[in-house]
Amino acid sequence: MKTERFWRFNKQDKIEIDESGLVKFLEQLGYASYYTMTNKTSEPLYVFRSGYIVEPIIPSRIHTDTIHALESGIIDEDILPPAIRNEVLSKLMGSKMILKKEVTLALKELDKPMKIDTKDCAYFFYRNNAVKVTRDKIQLLPTDQLDFYVWKSQIIDRNFELIDLETITTKSEYYKFLANVSMRPVSGKLENDLERLNNLLRLQGYLLHDYKDRANPRAVVLMDVSDKGEPAGRTGKGLIIDGISKLKKTIKEDGKSFKDDNRFKFSLVTIDSKVVYLDDVPAKFNFENFFSVISEGITVELKFVNKFYIPYD
């Protein structure tokens, strides 16, 4: 790897690190800053980019991964000979300069936006293709022509294969499962209910589409109902969420132990999370406390880490 030198020898023939040069080297490796607020009133998050794929990363990982990269000889030996490399490594590890805020805050922002679904289309990303989905068609996009970045967690770890509707409705185990849980009891027997099935499919489509209308914010509530019209468990909610999680990064919270007054209640949520699932909430769960989260956004606070905000859109 060719790079400008971010080290020099002082008058005492000791290695010194040039901070501005170090920042440029980190950027060359793929590190960047990412602001969740357009007005930049909070500190940025940090990311690592490789091609069109971006991954959230904490400063300690930037330090560790950079050290490992240098140890592996990522910089060409004609620029950084092995003997000098050891001195540079010792200086970086001893001073922990990579962790200094003056260094990380100087990292440039991403040069392209993150992928955002629009009202009329959604994007999905597989190992072999990007897929653009609209009401009328499914279009394959070459990834080398994308003009945006994508979170690493959004890459679905399999190849995309377009399957016709008849095959889905006759051979897909997941479709059969959805059809079964959509059945309704009639005179002691279960009968197919196309309306309930279509509603369940629309519900999943809503969760898989990142676009959200500020004028019409929604939350999805899944409740099992017995043949007596009463709530009942163990009839498929968890499997539906598992299905969603195969396509979108989903965070599961224990609904019974979830406390709204806990400042760290969303500590499992990350900047690339797409769905938050509260599992098995109590009967008297106060849903009104979620109105601001549903209509505005989520503030995530972790112990010993700066909190950050995920806006509604």
Regions found by a protein language model. Give the residues of each.
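N-terminal nucleic-acid engagement/recognition segments and initiation subdomains in replication
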Residues: 1-172, 180, 184
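P-loop NTPase catalytic core of nucleic-acid-dependent motor ATPases
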Residues: 33-52, 56-60, 132-272
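Alpha-helical scaffold elements adjacent to nucleotide-binding pockets in ATP/GTP-utilizing enzyme cores
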Residues: 65, 239-243, 289-293
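Conserved catalytic/switch belt of AAA+ P-loop NTPases
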Residues: 249, 286-311
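Conserved catalytic network of the ASCE P-loop NTPase/AAA+ motor domain
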Residues: 267-271, 283-284, 309-313
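Hydrophobic "anchor" residues on beta-strands that sit immediately upstream
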Residues: 275
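Walker B catalytic acidic pair
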Residues: 278-281
